[in-house]
UniProtKB/Swiss-Prot annotation:
It is an enzyme of class 5 (isomerase). The keyword Kinase does not apply. The lineage of its organism: Eukaryota, Metazoa, Ecdysozoa, Arthropoda, Hexapoda. Its EC number is 5.2.1.8. Residues 113-251 are annotated as: Disordered. Transmembrane segments: none annotated. This is 39 kDa FK506-binding nuclear protein. One of its GO terms (molecular function) is juvenile hormone response element binding. It is found in: Nucleus. PANTHER family: 39 KDA FK506-BINDING NUCLEAR PROTEIN (PTHR43811:SF19), FKBP-TYPE PEPTIDYL-PROLYL CIS-TRANS ISOMERASE FKPA (PTHR43811). Residues 222-237 have a biased composition (Basic and acidic residues). The gene is Fkbp39. PPIases accelerate the folding of proteins. May function in a signal transduction cascade during early development.
C-alpha cells in the first residue's frame, strides 16, 4: 500500500536530503504568487523539472527517488508551490542501498517504462514474501520527509574528498606493484653476472677449463634473453587500447570505444545492463544520466530504446565504455522530447556495458 507524500515549498528556498525511503513525485502545483520554476539538483547536476504560472497552475510529473540518493529541490520566482506524491511500499523495494533516480521518460519513455515493469516482475519472483512494516514506522518516515533540511550539500564534498584520498592510495599501491614487477627481470640478470668474473679467472687455467667455462657462458647468455622477455608476456593482461577514431555504422550513428571490454559480447536479442550519461551535441548539456546503483536494462534490437542505442550498443563487451553519437533520425527526430530535448537534436551518449543476460 502506497502512502501520501507532500511538500510545501516557499519562494527561493532550498530543500535537501539524503533519502531514507523511496518515494514518487506525481505533480507540482502553484500555491501563491505569479510564477515559479522548480529545479532538482542531484549527482552534481541541475535540472529544470517544471514551470508553473497562473495560466498553467499545475504540471504532472513522474519522478522516482530511491533510498540513499542525495537530492535538493529549490524554486526560482515569486510563487510558493506544492509537491505531491506518495511513498513506495516497503515490501516492493529492493535491498540495494544506492539505487539512483533517473528521468527515464527522456529516453524513449514508453518503452523504458515497459522494460522497468518487466524488471519489477523479475525482482518480485526473486524476492519472496516479506513481513509487513508497522504503521507506526511508516508514520515516522512520513514525518521525516515532511521536514527537508536546508543547505545540506557540504557532506557530498567531504565524501568526494574521501573518495579521492582512497583512490590516490590505490594508485600508489598499483604504481609500487608495477615497479616491483619491472625490477624482477633485472634482479635475475644480476645473479648471472658472476659468470663474467669466472671468465676472467678461467683465462689463467688450462685449455680444458676454458672450454667448460665457454659452454657455461653460452648457456648463461641464453637464459637472460629468455628472462628478459618474461615481462612482455604480462602485457596482454593490461587493458586493451581503444581506438579514438570514430566509426560510422548503421543509420549514420558514430561510435568511439574508450575502453574495450573483455566480457561477454552484446548481441541482438540479448538483454543488457548499462550505465549512461546523455548530452546534447549542440551545447554539451546533460539531459539524462544513470551512473550508479541498479543499471538500466533493455532488450538489444527489440525497439525498447531509440534506434541509435539498438545499433550503437551492439558489439560492446562487458566492461567496455563507448561514446555513441546519434543523429536526429536515430534519436527523437523532428518531434524531440520536450522540454530537455529539442526538435532535430543530435545526442551524444557515454555508455558503459555492465552485464549481458
Amino acid at each position: 500500500m502506497s502512502m501520501f507524500w507532500g511538500l510545501n515549498m516557499k519562494p527561493e528556498r532550498k530543500y535537501s536530503q539524503t533519502i531514507i525511503k523511496s518515494f514518487h513525485i506525481s505533480g507540482v502545483a502553484l500555491d501563491k504568487g505569479q510564477e515559479a520554476k522548480l529545479y532538482l539538483a542531484a549527482e552534481k547536476q541541475e535540472y529544470i523539472v517544471a514551470t508553473v504560472t497562473k495560466a498553467i497552475p499545475q504540471v504532472a510529473l513522474d519522478l522516482n527517488f530511491s533510498k540513499g540518493d542525495r537530492i535538493m529541490f529549490y524554486t526560482a520566482g515569486d510563487a510558493s508551490v506544492s509537491l505531491l506524491g506518495y511513498l513506495h511500499d516497503i515490501d516492493s523495494e529492493d535491498d540495494e542501498d544506492d539505487d539512483q533516480m533517473t528521468i527515464e521518460n527522456l529516453l524513449n519513455s514508453k518503452a523504458i517504462k515497459n522494460s522497468k515493469k518487466s524488471e519489477d516482475d523479475e525482482d518480485e519472483n526473486e524476492s519472496g514474501e516479506e513481513d509487513e512494516e508497522d504503521t507506526d514506522d511508516d508514520s515516522q518516515i512520513i514525518e521525516e520527509y515532511e521536514s527537508f533540511l536546508e543547505n545540506g550539500e557540504e557532506e557530498d564534498d567531504d565524501d568526494v574528498d574521501e573518495d579521492n584520498e582512497e583512490s590516490g592510495e590505490e594508485d600508489e599501491q598499483d604504481s609500487d606493484d608495477s615497479e616491483a614487477e619491472e625490477e624482477q627481470p633485472k634482479a635475475k640478470v644480476a645473479k648471472l653476472s658472476p659468470g663474467a668474473s669466472a671468465k676472467k679467472s678461467g683465462k689463467e687455467q688450462n685449455g680444458v677449463a676454458k672450454k667448460e667455462e665457454a659452454k657455461q657462458q653460452q648457456k648463461k647468455k641464453e637464459k637472460p634473453e629468455a628472462k628478459k622477455e618474461q615481462p612482455k608476456a604480462k602485457e596482454p593482461a593490461k587493458q586493451q587500447p581503444a581506438s579514438k577514431d570514430p566509426r560510422t555504422i548503421t543509420g549514420g550513428v558514430k561510435i568511439v570505444d574508450q575502453v574495450v571490454g573483455k566480457g561477454e559480447e552484446a548481441k541482438q536479442g540479448k538483454r543488457v545492463s548499462v550505465y549512461y550519461i546523455g548530452r546534447l551535441q549542440s551545447n554539451n548539456k546533460t539531459f539524462d544520466s544513470l551512473l550508479k546503483g541498479k543499471p538500466f536494462k533493455f532488450a538489444l534490437g527489440g525497439g525498447e530504446v531509440i534506434k541509435g542505442w539498438d545499433v550503437g550498443v551492439a558489439g560492446m563487451k562487458v566492461g567496455g565504455k563507448r561514446v555513441i553519437t546519434c543523429p536526429p533520425h536515430m534519436a527523437y527526430g523532428a518531434r524531440g522530447a520536450p522540454p530537455k530535448i529539442g526538435p532535430n537534436s543530435t545526442l551524444v551518449f557515454e555508455v558503459e556495458l555492465k552485464a549481458v543476460h
